[in-house]
Amino acid sequence: MESLKRPPAITTALCRGRDVSYPEIYEVLQGNALFMLQRCDSDGAVLEALAVNAKPGDKLVIPPQYGHATVNIGDEPLVFADLVATACSNTYGQIAQNHGMCSYVLKKDNGFEIVQNPAYG
């Protein structure tokens, strides 16, 4: 599994008088997953985009302020666990407005291809 650099924490919620941001933790239980992550500025410009391939047993921490999607890139069903704080709220308005993440994952005969979503310019 590829490693991710931890970005600086960005406040997303308040908890017990302290500023707290919330990551998510995923574990792949079965199948082969491609986690697509993106972080955008307040105007919607993509600051960072990552693709992380994970197999059974791999764990991935999604940093706060990253939009993410999980794609099954294998031939068997994909099963994963997601640990997230109940106080966490996700906002995917920009992703819906742009018809997906900044990159699409397309199936090919011998795997997959990642292509840019033209809605992000």
Features from the language model and the residues they span:
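Active-site region of the double-stranded beta-helix
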Residues: 1-54, 71-121
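Histidine-centered metal-chelating micro-motifs
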Residues: 34, 58-60, 64-69
